Amino acid sequence: MDQTLIEVEGVTKSFVVRRRAGRLRRTREVVNAVAGLDFTVRRGEMVGYIGPNGAGKSTTVKMLTGILLPSTGRLRVAGADPVRDRVRLAQRMGVVFGQRTTLWWDLPLRDSYELARRIYRIPAGTYARNLDRCVELLELGPLLDVPVRQLSLGQRMRGDIAAALLHEPEVLYLDEPTIGLDVVSKRRVREFLAQTNAERGTTVLLTTHDLTDIEQLCSRVMVIDHGRVVYDGGLDGLHRQGRSERTLVVDLERELPPIELHGTRLVRREGTRQWLAFPASASAAPLVAELAGRYELRDLSVREPEIEDVIARMYGEAERTAATVARIG
């Protein structure tokens, strides 16, 4: 069996936006939401698909699910065209949009699941087994007879994820699945998704602004900005690519003036604690040795940059590149 489940080759998506140019005139502007995407996703992968607002994440998901037609390029999911073979592919994919529910608003959760069973023609035994699993792992038991409109956002999101998995899809598209959820609900959703991937080999494409989702779930990350993939690889590689500095956190026995240490720069100072940045390519050992020889230390640690800082730096570089291309063009 071919291990490639999703293929995206040279895909673009443009929209025409009409803007007022005067009291009686309007101008037409072409906006490129996606500008030349190329990537593949293998069966069983959990891939984080991240980027700033307007980067093209949701547009990509809508094209992969057949909701939108690409302007140019080629898309294949399980060897099929998402638009032309949309009905057939619906049996093989599940979709959760964080800001839109697929559940029936005025019906109890249980009835929404029963409708899904009939729509997808799920065998009774498969349906019962999958429903029991979702109810147990997502703690949906007390909610089954509650109308969807009375559920909290976190409860509804758990309900949506269960609905998307009842028919055992090969691929699950999650667009902001933890948006607005509390800490407990987020943890429960993450644990469920990780278990589903491990036990069933379900392929997951996850778009999110919560980078903890990515760190805890995904072995691979794609960063998209201005409609293009600017990074595709593992979390370790992402840290290395965006890492320009590390930080020495120095806890002194008493409050002292700013530390002056060759090869570092002071970035913060609070009481007896000082933060010193140094190049990521430099070894921390000689800096630590010099600090230990010159000062009475209570504690000392080396901190790697947070993933949020790494990605923010990548977004900034993509912004500058796009501006340069626009000027040249």
What are these regions (language model features)?
Residues 166-170:
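A short, proline-enriched helix->beta-strand linker immediately N-terminal to the Walker B motif
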Residues 65:
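Helix-to-loop junction immediately C-terminal to a conserved catalytic motif
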Residues 172-176:
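Catalytic Walker B motif of ABC-type/P-loop ATPase nucleotide-binding domains
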Residues 114, 118, 125-143:
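Conserved ABC ATPase "signature" region
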Residues 190-279:
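ABC transporter nucleotide-binding domain
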Residues 73-84, 89:
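Conserved ABC transporter NBD signature motif
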